[in-house]
Amino acid sequence: MKLNREDVLHIARLAKLGLEEDEINRLSKELSALLEHFEVLQQVDTTGVEPTAQSTPVKSVLKEDIIKPSYDREEILSNAPRREGDYVRIRAVME
């Protein structure tokens, strides 16, 4: 699949990226090559292969949660630059 200039610009807008002209041309080629690799993978016959997210057996690497004493809520909130009730108030990070 070949991505054209408009495709790259659309993807960049979705990702909120500003691209220079040379970046648009380079990304068009690189993303097209990447999609071609996926097209090859789509042709692989996976009949009879169980879907999996992990190809090798792995035991859980997560540690068990251990409850420990924490700081006093009021002490934490008193150090916050802004607070609203029992919450720390911050600037919006998303539009």
From Swiss-Prot:
MF terms (GO), sorted A to Z: asparaginyl-tRNA synthase (glutamine-hydrolyzing) activity; ATP binding; glutaminyl-tRNA synthase (glutamine-hydrolyzing) activity
Domain of life, source organism: Bacteria
Gene3D superfamilies: Glu-tRNAGln amidotransferase C subunit, N-terminal domain (1.10.20.60)
Catalyzed chemical reaction(s): L-glutamyl-tRNA(Gln) + L-glutamine + ATP + H2O = L-glutaminyl-tRNA(Gln) + L-glutamate + ADP + phosphate + H(+); L-aspartyl-tRNA(Asn) + L-glutamine + ATP + H2O = L-asparaginyl-tRNA(Asn) + L-glutamate + ADP + phosphate + 2 H(+)
GO cellular component entries: glutamyl-tRNA(Gln) amidotransferase complex
Keywords, alphabetical: ATP-binding, Ligase, Nucleotide-binding, Protein biosynthesis
Enzyme Commission code: 6.3.5.-
HAMAP family (UniProt xref): GatC (MF_00122)
Family under the similarity heading: Belongs to the GatC family.
Name this polypeptide is given: Aspartyl/glutamyl-tRNA(Asn/Gln) amidotransferase subunit C
